[in-house]
Each structure stands twice: as C-alpha cells, then as structure tokens.
C-alpha cells in the first residue's frame, strides 16, 4: 500500500498522539514493531538489522522536513520515537488541566453539525488519554452531554433514566444523532419569520449603490426533478420562493410610493428594516443586533443599553411596511458594545415596540467602517483591522451578539457572580440561600441556576483531604453567649499592610456568629477578648458563661485569668495536641482562611491583603447559612441581630472601583480615580488606593466586578504628586496607614439603591471595632439606613494594569511638564534634594533608575526626582564586610561640617582625634624636605552604632591618602590578616557549649599603634594652622597608609605573644592561652580593632583586659552585644545572632520598607536568559548585592543561594536582575527579626558534622553544577556554609556530587585544624552526609570506575581523606539533606522546613523555645 492510500500525513508538530498511533499500526503491519518496543538483543542478526532499517525508513518517510533533525543517522528507530515523545508527548498535570479546561468550555453551536462536534470531542478525549489522564466511560458520557444546548434536554433526561450498565458512548452518540434529525425536521416545518415589514429608505441613491454588486437575476436554486419542492409563502405555489414571486413584486411596486411618503413623515432618516417577530432566542438575545443593509439608522428596544441618551420630543413617528402601522422612537443616544473589539454606535434610536435591535450598514459606512458579506456571514472592519465578525445567522440574516457597556444595565443573576460575591461560597450553600427566605431582598436570587463551571480559585484555596468521621455535638445551648469558642491563627507571612501577623476569632456557639480581630502579637488577644465581652454583653444584656480554648499561653496569662474570674467566665481547655476538642473554632479558622485564600487568589492580589480578606470572609460567613444552627433557615447574622441581612451591597473581593472625587475640580480634571475593593465598612466600601498607598472608605463609587486586579499591577511605590493637579492627594491625608472616611451627602430615607449598614445593630464591624485599625472619621451629615450611589459595570475594556501604568504615566507627565520651562517653583527644592543626594553618595539625577528616595511625608517634593546610584562608588570591589557603613548620614568633607546642624559633635570628634595623635606622638611637624614624596591626607567621618542600630559615638578619623604612596619607597609589604566570620561563630559555639564568658574590647585609634619602618612625610591635615611649607614626618602608622593595618597587627600579635598566647595555624587572628582546661583557657579573636575575649575564668579575663589596657588605649565593652554589625543576645543556654537593624536600613535605603513580604528569596523557577541579557537599566544592583552578601555571610544562610545566583550576573545590571534583587528585599521584609541560634547540646554525638549536596547542571546558561555544603558543631550550631558554582561542567550527577564533596572536605579539614590548633581533639572522623550513592562509592572504592576516570586528580583528594579515616561519608535521603537549601531555589514549604532545621527562627519561634 503506497503512501497516498495510507493517508498518513507527515508529522508537522500537530496531533502527535494520532500520528504515533498510525505509525505504530503501520510498523505492526510491516512486522517491525518489535524494534521500537523491545530491547536490542546482545547479538544483532541480519533480520533485526533489516527490521531496524525498515522501521527507521518508515518513520522518517512520515516526518516533515523541519522535523528530520529528530532522526539523525546514528540513532535507532526506537530512539527517534523516544526523542519525539520527550517533546510532544505531554503527560504533565499542566497539560491535563489545560485539556480539561478546553473540554469543559466546549459547547455545540447552532452552526455546527453533531458529527463535527463529536469529532472535536473525541479528539479532546484522545489528547487527554495521551496526556496520561484516566477517563471512565461514564465520565466521557457526562462531558459530552454537558456540551449540548437546551434543545437536547429531552433526550438527555431520557438517557439519565437508563441503567449505567447499559450506557456506552457509542449508544449515546447514536441516540443524539437521531435527536438531531428530529430537531432539524421540526425546524423546517416551523420556519421562523424574521422580517414582518419593510420600509424603503427615501435615500434611493444609497440603496442603489449598496445593492449594486448584488446579482439582480434570480438564481435557479433547484435543478432537475428534485424530490424536494420549495413553496412560495406569498402565493402558495411550488417551484419558487417569495422574493422571486411575480405577484409579490407587483404588489410591492404598487405600494412603493405610498411607503416612501410615510417614511418622510416620520423622519428624514427612515428606518428601513423592522424586526417584529424573532423566535430563535438561542441566537439573539437583548444584546443581539440584526445587521440590516437597508436601514438608515440604528435602533434598539432596550433603553438600558444606552450609556448616554436624550429624549426625542415629540416622539419620532416611524412607519413599518404593513400599511397603516407605526412605531415611535422616544430617545436617541450612544450605545457601547463589545464583540471581539469595542464598537460605539451614535444616534441610536430607542423604540419600545420593536421586537429586536437593528444595526444600520449605512451608519457603519458613514463611520468609516467597511462591511463584507460572504457565505459564512459578515465581517465589519475599520482601517484594515477586524472589529466585529458575526456569530450567528437567523434565516440567512446576519445576527451579531454583543456585550453592552451600560452603566444602567441590570446585572444578570449569574451563578458564578453570586458565588464570588459571597466570597466563593459552596454551590450547596448558595442554592440553600436561594431556597430559603434569608434576605430582605431575596428576589435578587430568584433566577439562579446551578453552574457546572469549575472555579479555579476555589481549588487553589480550598482543596483538602477527604473528611474524617465527626462526633456528634450533644451539647444543647439555649441562648447566645452561653458558650464562646476562641482560637488564634498565625503567624502569617507576609504581614498585612498595617503590620499584623495573626488574627483571633470569637465564635458564639448558639448563633454561630463570628467576630474576627487582626493582631500583631499574641499578647493582644486579651485586649480583644475584653472588647468582645464588653460589646456582646451590652448587645444581648447577657453574660458569657463558658470560654472554650486551647492551651495557648496567650489565653493563660494572669491578666486573662483574673478577668475571667471577675466576669464569672469558666475556662474549658482542650487536651494538648487534640484540636478536635475545640472543633468549632478550628473549623471556623479553616473556613475563614480557605475563603480568604480563595478571594485573594481569585482577585490576583498580593498576599499582604490577607488581613482584609480575612475580615471580609468573616463578614460573609456571618451571612451564610450554617448547619450548626438549630434553625437552618436563618443566618448567623439574623440570629445575632434578629433581622435579615441585605444582599445588594455584596461585591466581588478585589473588584475595580471608580471613586468619585468630591473636592472642587478643574473643568477638565478627572472626576474619579481607581481603587480596589477590599472589604465592607458600616457606611461604605473599604477600598485600597494603590497610587497613594492608603485605605479609604467611600460610597459614591462605580464597581466593575468583571475587572479583577493583577498582582503585578499593585506596586507600593511612592508617587510624588504635583501640587494642584493631583486632586486625590488633597482628598486624603498623607498617612498611608490610616483609614480615611469620606464625607457622605444627605440621602433620603427610602432609596432603591444599596444599603450600607450604619446602624450599630446591623454590623458586627461596628459592634466590634478592630482596635489595631483606628478609623479617622470626619463629621457626617444625617444619613439614611438604606441608600447609596453605587453604579455597576457589567463589563469594561479597562485593564487593571492601571495601578502601575497610571502611576508611571503620572510620573512621566510630571517630569515632562517640569522640563518644558525654567520657571518651575520647585526648582530650588529639587536642587536642594540633588545636593542632599550627593551628600549620601548618589550622583546627579538621571532617568529610568526605578528607585525613589522617601522623605518624611511632610517634606516630600511634589515631583519625583529621577536619581541614579554611582556605580563606581557602589561596586562589588569594596570589601563586603564593610557594607554596613554605607548608610551613615555623615559629612563627606571637612568643609561640609560648617553647614550641618550637628557641627559641634563633629568638631568635638576632630579635636579628640587630634589630641590622640598628639598623645601618641604620631608625627613631628617639620619643613618640607626636598626630593621626598609627600603623602596627602583627608578627614573621614563615621558614626558608631549599638546593637539596636542607634548612634553612640561620632568618630572623625584622619587618614592618609595611600594611593599617593610609592612602592618600595613609602611601603613594601601590606597584607594584614583578619578573622574569618566563621571563626567568630566557632568561638561563640565553644562559649555556649562550655559555659564560657565572652567580652569585647574596642581599641582606640588602633592603627596609630603601628611602628613604621619607612620614612614617610604627610601633608598637614585640615584644622591645623601652621606654615604652609611645613609637613608632618610620621613617627607611627596612620590610617590610610597601605601598611597601616599590617603594622597594627604585628604590634598586637607581639603583645599577645609576650603573654604566651599562641595563634592558630589556620586563622592567625585567633589566639589561645592554653592552661590545660577549656574553662581556664583564654581565647582571643581580633577583627581589625575589635577584640573578642572568651574564657570560663573571670579572674583571668579581668587580668588580661587590664594588661591590654596598659599596652593600648582601649574601651572595655564588657559582655559582647554588638560585633561588626551583628547583634548578639546572650542567654543562659542560648545565643542569638541577628542583623535586624541593618536589614531595616537596607530596606529604607532602597525604598522597600513598605513592600509586600514573600515567603522565599527567589522563585523556584528562574528565567536565566533574562538575567543574562545585556539590557542596562542603571539600577544599583551591585550595591544591593554587596549589602545582601554581608547579611548572608554573617547571620543569614537562607540568603546564600539567592545571593550566589544573582551575583553571577552583577555585571549585567538589567531589569530582571533588579526585580529578583527586590524580591530578596521583600523576603527580608517578612523575616526582619530572623535570628541564628546557638544552643548548648549536652547529648551531642559529633563535635563537627557536615552536609554536602549539588544541583547538577542547574545553571541554564553554561550548564555548570552548583555546590552547597554546611557544617555544624555539637550537632546543632551552624558555623560554616557555602554555595559555589563549580568550575567545570559535570558529565553526571555523581560527578557533580563528587566535585562538591571535594569542597566540603577542604572546609572540614580547616575546621579540624582549627580545633586542633586550640588543643581540642577530635576522637572520631568528621561525618559528612551525602545523598548520592554513586559519589559515596567512588570515594570509598580506590578502584577506577568508568564514570570517574576523567575526573580531575585534585578531586580525588576527598577519597584520600576517606581512606585516611579523617572523613566518614554517610548516606542520607534527599528529603533529609539540609544542604539542599544551598544548591537551588526551593518551593516555599521545602525552603521553610530546611531553614528551620538550620537553626534560623523568628522572634515568636525563638520565644516559644
């Protein structure tokens, strides 16, 4: 059989499953299927080779040319199919979800035959099965029946009555095809009449031109002796139709003149077409328009479609074709419609008697549109772009369905819409609400019908495990407040916009009414309970009797107990670890969180809006029926307030809201601005103004529930508004964290609009105010209980990207306006700002930096300065550990001091420095020698901070400009060691494990103690009055000299050696005075001029400190609290290390202090191509990377992977890099109080243990792997960690793990030598956990494996240490591998799990310990 007869289309990337099925059938026919299904035999004979050639040739024959790269010459037929499978056989969950969505949205249209519909349906089912989905026969039948329109309801009902055992898909299809024939026969027997009357247009020229291209001679439709005979609807004879009937044409010609006169009496733009009878309502609804080529005006029969209209006085009389009949147009206006694109119709007439809507071809052409008729219908286009394509035909007349942008159009009672308005309520609850009379305006729900549509936000927010059997509640409560349940949920990250971490609920068991408060700390529970008891007891005039709670400490405080005793409230505590005993509150919290999570997901808002979602969820839950109530026909709200709630004001969470601006506006200023609906208040909607970053409460609004917010659009960036043109800045005060209530106008008592619950008895939010959210209220005029001015948009063309786009556009417009002229009143203030930016190290303003400097609101400029950072001053070439000094607001020069408010403090610091030099005899003033290099000098200023980040001392340092020194004349050796930060953590680990004391001393002017070997002359410093020919001959070292640090280190080391201290062989800045006992030994760590001393003998400690103070000018800081920017909190058996003050400064510096927190530093999927792009956005990426690296090296190992990955692209400086860096800041925002914990472990098994892992080929750019390892002391204290991209590409995961092991072994040996150097011995080999069995095998086995023969020799160093019993490798499952966090970005749950195991805990967690 040749290729043509087989009818197999060459594969071109489409329908791979069908193509593969046919190819396999062909290979089976050729008896060569075994070569693609079976394994190749050890001995390949000629028959196998022949079958292989045949199979490969067949597959290649049915591949299109563009896909031949899958079939290279050196691969087999089986490998070709495997390569194609890898690309086109999609069996992922995402593929299945996309196909299921298509299947659920599939509907049979009126133009499509049932056989074509079956074909599309079967293709989708086949694709689903190919994607790995399991679909039962009944599922296929159910999906098929769902796709059918209402005309098949009868046969569907009949099918539903059949037994499932007798039902097959083929049987159902057969019955449906029979039904299709019946429907078509019924349709032909009762042909619909579309046009009842024809009115001729008086504009005959237009009509003649319009029909010029039409065939005037009637076509002969039926040829031969056709069995099918047509019949004329006019004369009743067979063989022709009405339009070709000569009797009809004669009557039409006779009445032509009379009809034209009737049109002229009605209007000069007479209606040429009138629909009087339309029976096919499935095609044309209220927003359907018949396209009429003879009409001279548009006409509608529903005035709610108008967006703007005027009365026609007197009414316009319009004659129809039937003699003696007239209709009247009473309005004329504008209608906005949308099909694929928006179209606006002007001068549209409204006639109530019309049975349908008409769209005039003439009016469309006058508006510049072109209309093309073809067999499928009609296409309307403008300027070559398609605007509308008709979606249906009605008796060969084009009918176009639209959605109307009508402010007055009533909302359709859509099941999905009310589902979202009720906060994604369950379908059963919504139907129960419809059945029972629970609301004052219950009629709004009369037309609800159950929808089969799947709600994806509900799945994202609510999907859970199947329930367990519940015990029946046998408690019989007779009144409210008899039993109250309470529980706390949290901490929740990110924090809310007003910095809340928890929420607490109080549930009354009798009414099932819930009150929710947002709180920052668990200790706030008591004040919230007081508020609840006071308000609820006053409401009912009853007492709370029982309080059901768990054993949380927030409920067991002394003040809580005393309050309950005073009020006569009895505690009922649950058994520990048995939350089922407090099931009411546990279930309520679950319901609230699921509903809130779903609303945030559905609204596409940032997670920091969870607090508003929780309050809104509570508000809605109180208005939803509960099975826990004795009377299930009532809601908790009605049980609590004794009256029914209202529905009118319910709106979809996260909807776009247009707020009316009440302040006096310019003639052409906007009268509204956009915001986001986030909740309900007693007198209006609670809204988030994203531009001005504040909550507002308003009632004069328009709500667009179809337009949800995109999370990327809501950026909390400061907007510098212009003075008079940004009116909303006047409406609302500058405090972005307060809720501002707008003023309400007087309203009538009876109003048909939406009711806002102002009465204290109508709103639980009024009864129970959230103390943590103070509401600033202006004075209100008298307001009605049931009134509002809210209007609703059913659809909108606007996109929610406005939150960012409008902000950016406003900033651009302001910037352009300022650049047009020089007479800007803000110029002087801008120049002052520019000077201030220079003072803190920022260059002249440039554009597109993406950074904003926030002043205090009262001092903010009205325009946004475009600033950029000096890349030269903020490069990674600076020492990372000095990154914490970049935030000091200090003078940049000696002359600048004269203009500062703190002038006296700096002058005092300068005098102190000069006196120190005088006492120290640092220099001798002499005449300038000839032929000698003179080193320049300058003043450097800084501020020293305590552990809380508060300034404690102003420091002025006179430094030499070392770059003016000459090599081998002014200096030779310059290197000076400094202690590793891991050495500092090593000392702290010893301190906590062996109960040592650790103190700190600060060396004053440390470098001035160094002795110079060279003869150096320096220019006189500013502040000393002397002969200009004089210079300073340096007697001792001074800051800034290249050799100053080395000179100081040599002097300090010599002083310690005089006391018999010995320094470590692996870290020269660690010294030990060995007394044979760890508690009596003295350990010293030197970090430049900071000295850390640890010992268990305080007498030796004090003696040693006195010795140092005799040798050098020093400050005794006693117990260590703050070291190189790290805050140290000492407790009896724990040490906490944190850098919260520094993190806050970073957030402030980069304008991210009000950002939204995220749960991980980086997303689990990173776009490396965008990170590697050459786009230059002029953002301070390098400066930020340096700051993050300092945090990561000191106390935050959770940042290691993120900083390592992003620093690889620090030279790119593109927008993707900047966005990822800002995400790291957002993560820091949510973990400011994160602490690294060291604690005493009496049951430790290993003094040092390690974990090592690698991410094979994780770098998508160069495919190199990433090494990650960590080491702990005493099984808990984390002292070393590292992430590093490997130098070469690994051929396998085993090789990548082996290369990572090499790096870990080197670090382990360093720790071993460090312990040995301070006389602490290791009894056992250092244990390193590895999760790759192949790597362990290579390290343990000295024989050469095939897969390891190419590995570089240096990596076998790890094997040598294993053989020497220095290192012991032990396998660990991947799920327990702690080093996994150092190899790649992880999902949030896995990341948090490993972060906790590293010993990183936040404040509340550390307190719980």
Swiss-Prot record:
User: Which residue stretches does the UniProt record annotate as biased composition, category Basic and acidic residues?
Assistant: 827-841
Q: Which InterPro entries match?
A: DNA/RNA_pol_sf, GAG-pre-integrase_dom, Integrase_cat-core, PolX-like_BBD, Retrotran_Ty1/copia-like, RNaseH-like_sf, RNaseH_sf, RVT_2
Zinc finger regions typed CCHC-type: which residues? 230-247
Keywords attached to this Swiss-Prot or TrEMBL record, sorted alphabetically, are: Aspartyl protease, ATP-binding, Hydrolase, Metal-binding, Nucleotide-binding, Protease, Transposable element, Zinc, Zinc-finger
Which superkingdom heads the taxonomic lineage of this protein's source?
Answer: Eukaryota
Q: Which residues form the signal peptide?
A: none
Annotated segments matching region Disordered: 760-780, 805-851
Q: Which organism is it from?
A: Drosophila melanogaster (Fruit fly)
Name by which UniProt lists this protein? Copia protein
Q: List the GO molecular function terms.
A: aspartic-type endopeptidase activity; ATP binding; nucleic acid binding; zinc ion binding
Matching CDD domains: RNase_HI_RT_Ty1 (cd09272)
Q: Work out whether the entry's keyword set contains Nucleotidyltransferase.
A: no
Which GO biological process annotations does it have? DNA biosynthetic process; DNA integration; proteolysis
Residues annotated as the enzyme's active site: 292 (for protease activity)
What are the record's GO terms for cellular component? DNA polymerase complex
Cell inner membrane as UniProt keyword: no
Instruction: Quote the annotated effect of residue 292 to A.
Output: Loss of activity
What Enzyme Commission number(s) does the record list for this chain?
3.4.23.-
* Integrase catalytic domain location: 476-644
Pfam families in alphabetical order:
gag_pre-integrs (PF13976), Pol_BBD (PF22936), Retrotran_gag_2 (PF14223), rve (PF00665), RVT_2 (PF07727), zf-CCHC (PF00098)
């Amino acid at each position: 059989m040749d290729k043509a007869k087989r009818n197999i289309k060459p594969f071109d990337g489409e329908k791979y499953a069908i193509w593969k099925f046919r190819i396999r059938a062909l290979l089976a026919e050729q008896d060569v299927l075994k070569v693609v299904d079976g394994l190749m035999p050890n001995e390949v004979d000629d028959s196998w080779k022949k079958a292989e050639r045949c199979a490969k040739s067949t597959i290649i024959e049915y591949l299109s040319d563009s896909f031949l790269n899958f079939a290279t010459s050196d691969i087999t037929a089986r490998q070709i199919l495997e390569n194609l499978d890898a690309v086109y056989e999609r069996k992922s969950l995402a593929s299945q979800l996309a196909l299921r969505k298509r299947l659920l949205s599939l509907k049979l249209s009126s133009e499509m035959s049932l056989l074509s519909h079956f074909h599309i349906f079967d293709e989708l089912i086949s694709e689903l099965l190919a994607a790995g989905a399991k679909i039962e026969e009944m599922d296929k039948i159910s999906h098929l029946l769902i796709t059918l329109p209402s005309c098949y309801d009868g046969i569907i009902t009949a099918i539903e009555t059949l037994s499932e055992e007798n039902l097959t898909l083929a049987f159902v299809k057969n019955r449906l095809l029979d039904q299709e024939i019946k429907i078509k026969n019924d349709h032909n027997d009762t042909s619909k009449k579309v046009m009842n009357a024809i009115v001729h247009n008086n504009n005959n020229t237009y009509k003649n031109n319009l029909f010029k291209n039409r065939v005037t001679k009637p076509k002969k439709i039926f040829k031969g002796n056709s069995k099918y005979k047509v019949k004329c609807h006019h004369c009743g004879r067979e063989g022709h139709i009405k339009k070709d009937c000569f009797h009809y044409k004669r009557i039409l010609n006779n009445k032509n003149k009379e009809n034209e006169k009737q049109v002229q009496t009605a209007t000069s733009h007479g209606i040429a077409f009138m629909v009087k009878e339309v029976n096919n309502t499935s095609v044309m609804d209220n927003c359907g328009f018949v396209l009429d080529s003879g009409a001279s005006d548009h006409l509608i029969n529903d005035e709610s479609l108008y967006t703007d209209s005027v009365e026609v006085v007197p009414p316009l009389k319009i004659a129809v074709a039937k003699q003696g009949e007239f209709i009247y147009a009473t309005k004329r206006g504008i209608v906005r419609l949308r099909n694929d694109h928006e179209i606006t119709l002007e001068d549209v007439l409204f006639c109530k008697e019309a049975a349908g809507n008409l769209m005039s071809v003439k009016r469309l052409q006058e508006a510049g549109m072109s209309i093309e008729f073809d067999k499928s219908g009609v296409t309307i286009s403008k300027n070559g772009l398609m605007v509308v394509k008709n979606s249906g035909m009605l008796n060969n007349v084009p009918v176009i369905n639209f959605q109307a942008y009508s402010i007055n159009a009533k909302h359709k009672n859509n099941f999905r819409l009310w589902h979202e308005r009720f906060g994604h309520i369950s379908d059963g609850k919504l139907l129960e609400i419809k059945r029972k009379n629970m609301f004052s305006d219950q009629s709004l729900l009369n037309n609800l019908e159950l929808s089969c549509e799947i709600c994806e936000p509900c799945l994202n927010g609510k999907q859970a495990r199947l329930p367990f059997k519940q015990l029946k509640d046998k408690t019989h409560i007779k009144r409210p407040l008899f039993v109250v349940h309470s529980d706390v949920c949290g901490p929740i990250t990110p924090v809310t916009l007003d910095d809340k971490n928890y929420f607490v609920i109080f549930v009354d068991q009798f009414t099932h009414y819930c009150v929710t408060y947002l709180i920052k700390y668990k200790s706030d529970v008591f004040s919230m309970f007081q508020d609840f008891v006071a308000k609820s007891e006053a409401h009912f005039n009853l007492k709370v009797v029982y309080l059901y709670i768990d054993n949380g400490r927030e409920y067991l405080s002394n003040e809580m107990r005393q309050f309950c005793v005073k009020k006569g409230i009895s505690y009922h505590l649950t058994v520990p670890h048995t939350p089922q005993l407090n099931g009411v509150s546990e279930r309520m919290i679950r319901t609230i969180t699921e509903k809130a999570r779903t609303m945030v997901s559905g609204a596409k808002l940032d997670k920091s809006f969870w607090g508003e979602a929780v309050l809104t969820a509570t508000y809605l839950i109180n208005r939803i029926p509960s099975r826990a109530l004795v009377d299930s026909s009532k809601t908790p709200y009605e049980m609590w307030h004794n009256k029914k709630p209202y529905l009118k004001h319910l709106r979809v969470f996260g909807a776009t809201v247009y707020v009316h601006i009440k302040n006096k506006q310019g003639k052409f200023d906007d009268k509204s601005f956009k915001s986001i609906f986030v909740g309900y208040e007693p007198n209006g909607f609670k809204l988030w103004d994203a531009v001005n970053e504040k909550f507002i409460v308003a009632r004069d609004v328009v709500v667009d529930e179809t337009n949800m917010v995109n999370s990327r659009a809501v950026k909390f960036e400061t907007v510098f508004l212009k003075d008079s043109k940004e009116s909303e800045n006047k409406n609302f005060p500058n405090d972005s964290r307060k809720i501002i209530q707008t003023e309400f106008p007087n309203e009538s008592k009876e109003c048909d609009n939406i009711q806002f619950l102002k009465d204290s008895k109508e709103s639980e939010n009024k009864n129970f105010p959230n103390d943590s959210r103070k509401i600033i209220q202006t004075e209100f005029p008298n307001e009605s209980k049931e009134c509002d001015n809210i209007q609703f948009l059913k659809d909108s063309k606007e996109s929610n990207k406005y939150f960012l786009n409008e902000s950016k556009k406003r900033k651009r417009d302001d910037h352009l306006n300022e650049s047009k002229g020089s007479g800007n009143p803000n110029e002087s203030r801008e120049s002052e700002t520019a000077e201030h930016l220079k003072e803190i190290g920022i260059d002249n303003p440039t554009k597109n930096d993406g950074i904003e400097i926030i002043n205090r609101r009262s001092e903010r400029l009205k325009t946004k300065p475009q600033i950029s950072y000096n890349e030269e001053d903020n490069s990674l070439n600076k020492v990372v550990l000095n990154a914490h000094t970049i935030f000091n607001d200090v003078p940049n020069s000696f002359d600048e001091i004269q203009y500062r408010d703190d002038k006296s403090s700096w002058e005092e610091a300068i005098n102190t420095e000069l006196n120190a030099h005088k006492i120290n005899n640092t220099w001798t003033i002499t005449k300038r020698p000839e032929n000698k290099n003179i080193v320049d000098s300058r003043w450097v200023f800084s501020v020293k901070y305590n552990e809380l980040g508060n300034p404690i001392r102003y420091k002025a340092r006179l430094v030499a400009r070392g770059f003016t020194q000459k090599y081998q004349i002014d200096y030779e050796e310059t290197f000076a060691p400094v202690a590793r930060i891991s050495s500092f953590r090593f000392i702290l680990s010893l301190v906590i494990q062996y109960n040592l004391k650790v103190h700190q001393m600060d060396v004053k002017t440390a470098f001035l103690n160094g002795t110079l070997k060279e003869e150096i002359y320096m220019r006189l410093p500013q502040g000393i009055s002397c002969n200009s020919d004089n210079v300073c001959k340096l007697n001792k070292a001074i800051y800034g000299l290249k050799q100053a640090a080395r000179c100081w280190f040599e002097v300090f080391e010599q002083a310690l050696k005089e006391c018999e201290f010995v320094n470590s062989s692996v870290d020269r800045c660690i010294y030990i005075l060995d007394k044979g006992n760890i508690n009596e030994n003295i350990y010293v760590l030197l970090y430049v001029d900071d000295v850390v001393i640890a010992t268990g003998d305080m007498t030796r400690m004090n003696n040693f400190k006195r010795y140092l103070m005799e040798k050098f000018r020093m400050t005794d800081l006693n117990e260590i609290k703050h070291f190189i920017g790290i805050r140290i909190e000492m407790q009896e058996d724990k040490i906490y290390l944190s850098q919260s003050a520094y993190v806050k400064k970073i957030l402030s510096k980069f304008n991210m202090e009000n950002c939204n927190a995220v749960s991980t530093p980086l997303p689990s999927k990173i776009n490396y191509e965008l990170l590697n792009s050459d786009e230059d956005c002029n953002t301070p990426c390098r400066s930020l990377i340096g700051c993050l690296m300092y945090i990561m090296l000191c106390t935050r190992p959770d940042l290691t992977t993120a900083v390592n990955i992003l620093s690889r692209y620090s030279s790119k400086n593109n927008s993707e890099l900047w966005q990822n860096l800002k995400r790291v800041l957002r993560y820091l925002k949510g973990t400011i109080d994160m602490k690294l914990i060291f604690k005493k472990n009496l049951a430790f098994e290993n003094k040092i243990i390690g974990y090592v892992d690698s991410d094979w080929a994780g770098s998508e750019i160069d495919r190199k792997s990433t090494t990650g390892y960590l080491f702990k002391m005493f099984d808990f204290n984390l002292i070393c960690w590292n992430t590093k991209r490997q130098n070469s590409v690994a051929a396998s995961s085993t090789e990548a793990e082996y290369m990572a092991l090499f790096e870990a072994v080197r670090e382990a040996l360093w720790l071993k030598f460090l312990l040995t150097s301070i006389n602490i011995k290791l009894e056992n080999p250092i244990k390193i956990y590895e999760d790759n069995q192949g790597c362990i095998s290579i390290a343990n086995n000295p024989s050469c494996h095939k897969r390891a023969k190419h590995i570089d020799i240096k990596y076998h160093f790890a094997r040598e240490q294993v053989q020497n019993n220095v290192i012991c490798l032990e396998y660990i499952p991947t799920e327990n591998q702690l080093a996994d966090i150092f190899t790649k970005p992880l999902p949030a749950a896995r990341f948090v799990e490993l972060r906790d195991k590293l010993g990183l805990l936040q404040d509340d967690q550390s307190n719980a310990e």
